[in-house]
């Protein structure tokens, strides 16, 4: 802990105590008042929260604090997610003596050895990190209402979740059946993103299997994502060095890689008959089940036994890897299948040659493959003549009948339609099948086991594939605010592909499924509408309502308004006035105004949040906004336990102090961007905050009570502009932009002001107090300290947003004065030995107003000589939008008065005495004939040496 961080920590402790004493963050509903209800994703207490969590929570906290300044009643609560396997997996690892996990927890999280020994108990581990994370949030200065805190294994919460699931079941959205799921072979249970290392969502894809067979009936099931190309197969590929197995699967003897046999065993009965190296099968001939053609099996070391079945069909006309490999073997035979605009008959050959690819090991083949596959899928059409290749091995009339089917549904069709047709037809014809796989492999369970796909027979699912439900979800996405806006497309895409999702398992902490013993609701399914629970748990506890009283009728009334307090009281035993109070509390806070989380939760939690809200709640209670922030890196690298570069939030607060840490997480990247947290940047921000503190102390000690001058008015006007830009940034959730305005741009204005005046005025103190309010969402402890030393009443956290108004005359005067200073400095005669600077001002400001139109005649009509009129128009054209806007807003402007008011400021900037004259004053001396060249905004300047 440095001296600087120690100062900020002590400052924070002081003001956090005062906030707690004033119960600032424990709001009560105020009927009729505007409100702002924000939540951020509650953490799993399977470890200490880190600066990545801190960033998400900071953004929510910044919004909460800003909206409080805007006069709204603000609620920002927090809970803890005990459900699922993350906690259980770590506890099991510690209990089994896993040295790696134990060492990580001691080194990264600073857990003492005597505490580690107790963490084999999952609830002890969860409570330990629950309390540690809560302390970290408090030290970080998050304005959380802890009176609403809960865990997801609290009995009240479990009753709430059971009600939610009964509602989904009533609406036909929970089903039981057969479906592929991500699966941990070790724990024998479905897994989702929160059950995996690095929270990686298992992406389940489907291979089409095409059953090529040799003369002995041994099937070689080629796994492909492009079954429409089966008509162009010229050979098969097998890795000669890989381990393969002959298996019995679905009544067939098949050759697949040993790894594929293991994966297939979770999708049907698999019996391994024998194992062999791939080279045993090289050189055989197998028959294409669609064309009847016999093709050879070649060896290829590029075949990955962990992908598909380890058996690959080769289509060199349309697959760059196949073309390059066969070219190396001098065995190329091309069969054209797909017409693509901009390509010839053989797209793979064309692209390989265009890119100068020389061999099958060239890395550029990856790019070539992407180009060909994308072009064929998006623009490709199946050739009409492919029909002639179908069923050559069949006798009549079967051959003609099959070709007629292909002519109708395959030939001349877009590739995507042909693919859909042939995928179904192969299975229906019994010459193909389906294999599911993890397409973003490897994905590992938190226990370290690689995830596979299992087809479950009697699993409970939430049916996110239901069409009407998807439409409601899309409607909400289109209506609500999403930050960043470009994430809206990601949500819509997720809604499109979401299908049935396993919602219960037989292992882990959590809520029992209410209608089926032995099942526990999984962690991404019990965390979709808990924001509503925050609004009622405080009263449930306050009134002493028991979990067994929280029956269906209670929740129906509180959340949906079903029934009357009197009717529900009879069923629950809860007094009517208490029921009414709880209902009113929910009604005041809901809908949720902002849901904050990391962008990695868009494909799961955040989209489930949307689905479940539209399923459970009426439209007026649907959430209004989602904020999905980017990740946090550390010194350019992803944080991970294996790299030992995870920075726990409480440790970061101790290293830098809460406000410097908040400033760094706010200012380093805009919300949607990934943030690279760097030590040097955090130190720089700490020093910037310290300089702001020193500036405020100087103001408090030196400000004098005097009539405001032009510089004072300019300061207030500039700060008013900074605050307005900050307000707009906060409103739009542009947290970095707001932080730049309040921590750097405002400081720069004050620095310039203090460098230009002998002593600051009381008006400057008022401006600094306004600045403290705008700074408070980012650096609340420093803002309180500044507010206090500058005489602010009460706590700045409760202060209304300042109403400073910019004075356009004061702003124009300062811009004009600085422009004149620059003009003087650009004159070649300016430099060493200047005795005085004489300035001649043209008083015809009306010419400048007229010149805004860009019309020379308008300036002449305002009284300017023609030659001068053209020059004034040219001058005005060079001005920026801001200066033109000020000129438009200011009716009259006296350049001589502005220069005279800033005389001391200008003489200090120029390092020489200055004299000011009106150019039309006949008594003024005409030094260097500069009077006649003076124009509005461009005075005549004489330099005497």
Swiss-Prot record:
Keywords: Aminoacyl-tRNA synthetase, ATP-binding, Cytoplasm, Ligase, Nucleotide-binding, Protein biosynthesis. PROSITE patterns: AA_TRNA_LIGASE_I. GO terms for biological process: leucyl-tRNA aminoacylation. A motif ('HIGH' region) lies at residues 43-53. Gene3D superfamilies: Class I aminoacyl-tRNA synthetases (RS) (3.30.2320.20), HUPs (3.40.50.620), Isoleucyl-tRNA Synthetase, Domain 1 (1.10.730.10), leucyl-tRNA synthetase (1.10.10.720), Valyl/Leucyl/Isoleucyl-tRNA synthetase, editing domain (3.90.740.10). It comes from the Archaea. ATP binds at residue 641. One of its GO terms (molecular function) is aminoacyl-tRNA deacylase activity. It catalyses: tRNA(Leu) + L-leucine + ATP = L-leucyl-tRNA(Leu) + AMP + diphosphate. It is found in: Cytoplasm. A motif ('KMSKS' region) lies at residues 638-642. One of its GO terms (cellular component) is cytoplasm. Belongs to the class-I aminoacyl-tRNA synthetase family. This is Leucine--tRNA ligase. The gene is leuS.
């Amino acid at each position: 802990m440095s001296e600087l961080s120690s100062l900020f920590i002590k400052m924070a402790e002081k003001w956090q105590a005062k906030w707690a004493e004033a119960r600032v963050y424990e709001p009560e509903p105020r009927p009729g008042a505007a409100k702002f209800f924000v939540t951020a994703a509650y953490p799993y207490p399977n470890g200490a929260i880190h600066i990545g969590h801190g960033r998400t929570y900071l953004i929510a906290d910044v919004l909460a604090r800003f909206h409080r300044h805007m006069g709204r009643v603000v609620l920002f609560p927090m809970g803890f997610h005990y459900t699922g396997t993350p906690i259980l997996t770590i506890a099991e690892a510690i209990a089994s003596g896993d040295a790696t996990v134990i060492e990580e927890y001691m080194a990264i999280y600073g857990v003492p050895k005597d505490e580690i020994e107790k963490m084999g108990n999952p609830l002890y581990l969860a409570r330990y990190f629950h309390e540690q994370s809560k302390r970290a949030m408090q030290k970080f200065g998050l304005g959380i209402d802890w009176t609403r805190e809960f865990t997801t294994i609290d009995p009240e919460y479990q009753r709430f979740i059971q009600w939610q699931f009964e509602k989904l079941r009533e609406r036909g959205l929970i089903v039981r059946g057969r479906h592929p799921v991500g699966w941990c072979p070790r724990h024998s249970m479905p897994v989702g993103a929160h059950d995996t290392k690095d929270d990686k969502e298992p992406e389940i894809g489907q291979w089409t299997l095409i059953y090529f067979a040799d003369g002995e009936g041994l099937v070689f099931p080629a796994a492909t994502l492009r079954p429409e190309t089966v008509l162009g197969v010229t050979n098969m590929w097998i890795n000669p060095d890989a381990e393969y197995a002959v298996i019995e699967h679905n009544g067939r003897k098949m050759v697949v890689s040993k790894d594929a046999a293991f994966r297939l065993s979770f999708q049907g009965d698999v019996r391994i008959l024998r194992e062999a190296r791939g080279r045993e099968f090289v050189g055989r001939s197998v028959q294409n089940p669609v064309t009847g053609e016999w093709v050879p099996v070649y060896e290829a070391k590029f075949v990955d036994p962990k992908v598909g079945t380890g058996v690959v069909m080769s289509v060199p006309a349309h697959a760059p890897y196949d073309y390059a490999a066969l070219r190396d073997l001098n065995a190329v035979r091309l069969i054209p299948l797909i017409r693509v605009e901009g390509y010839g008959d053989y797209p793979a050959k064309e692209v390989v040659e265009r890119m100068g690819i020389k061999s099958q090991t060239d890395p550029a083949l990856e790019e070539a493959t992407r180009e060909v596959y994308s072009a064929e899928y998006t623009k490709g059409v199946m050739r009409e003549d492919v029909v002639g290749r179908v069923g050559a091995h069949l006798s009549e009339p079967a051959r003609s009948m099959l070709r007629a089917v292909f002519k109708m549904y395959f030939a001349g069709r877009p590739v995507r339609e042909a693919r859909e047709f042939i995928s179904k037809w192969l299975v229906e014809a019994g010459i193909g099948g389906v294999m599911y796989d993890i397409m973003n492999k490897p994905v590992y369970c938190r226990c370290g086991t690689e995830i596979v796909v299992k087809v479950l027979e009697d699993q409970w699912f939430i049916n996110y594939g239901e069409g009407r439900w998807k439409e409601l979800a899309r409607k909400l996405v289109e209506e609500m605010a999403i930050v960043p806006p470009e994430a809206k497309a990601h949500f819509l895409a997720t809604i499109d592909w979401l299908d049935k999702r396993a919602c219960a398992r037989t292992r882990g902490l959590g809520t029992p499924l209410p209608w089926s013993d032995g099942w526990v609701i999984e962690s991404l399914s019990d965390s979709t509408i808990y924001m509503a629970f925050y609004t009622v748990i405080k009263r449930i506890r306050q009134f002493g309502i028991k979990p067994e009283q929280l029956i269906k009728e209670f929740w129906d009334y509180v959340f949906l308004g079903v029934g009357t307090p009197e009717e529900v009281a009879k069923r629950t035993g809860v007094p009517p006035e208490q029921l009414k109070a709880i209902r009113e509390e929910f009604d005041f806070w809901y809908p949720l105004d902002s849901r904050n989380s990391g962008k990695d939760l868009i494909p799961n939690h955040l989209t489930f949040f949307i689905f479940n809200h539209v399923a459970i709640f009426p439209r007026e209670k649907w959430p209004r906004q989602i904020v999905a922030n980017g990740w946090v890196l550390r010194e350019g690298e992803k944080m991970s336990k294996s790299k030992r570069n995870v920075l726990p939030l409480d440790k970061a607060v101790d290293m830098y102090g809460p406000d410097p840490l908040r400033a760094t997480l706010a200012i380093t990247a805009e919300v949607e961007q990934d943030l690279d947290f760097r030590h040097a940047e955090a130190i720089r921000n700490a020093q910037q905050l310290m300089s702001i503190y020193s500036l405020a102390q100087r103001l408090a000690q030196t400000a004098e009570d005097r009539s405001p001058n032009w510089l004072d008015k300019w300061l207030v006007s500039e700060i008013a502009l900074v605050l307005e830009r900050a307000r707009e940034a906060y409103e739009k959730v542009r947290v970095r932009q707001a932080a730049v305005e309040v921590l750097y741009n405002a400081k720069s204005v004050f620095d310039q002001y203090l460098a230009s005046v002998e002593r600051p005025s009381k008006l400057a103190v008022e401006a600094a107090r306004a600045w403290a309010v705008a700074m408070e969402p980012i650096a609340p402890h420093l803002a309180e300290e500044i507010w206090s030393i500058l005489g602010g009443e009460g706590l700045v956290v409760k202060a209304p947003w300042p109403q400073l108004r910019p004075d356009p005359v004061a702003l124009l005067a300062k811009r004009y004065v600085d422009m004149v200073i620059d003009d003087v400095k650009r004159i070649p005669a300016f430099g060493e030995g200047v005795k005085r600077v004489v300035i001649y001002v043209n008083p015809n400001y009306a010419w400048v107003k007229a010149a805004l139109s860009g019309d020379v005649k308008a300036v002449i009509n305002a009284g300017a000589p023609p030659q001068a009129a053209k020059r004034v128009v040219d001058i005005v054209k060079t001005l920026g939008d801001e200066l033109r806007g000020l000129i438009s807003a200011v009716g009259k402007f006296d350049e001589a008065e502005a220069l005279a008011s800033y005389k001391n400021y200008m003489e200090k900037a120029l390092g020489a005495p200055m004299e000011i004259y009106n150019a039309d004053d006949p008594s003024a001396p005409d030094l260097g004939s500069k009077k006649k060249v003076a124009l509005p905004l461009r005075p005549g300047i004489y330099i005497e040496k």
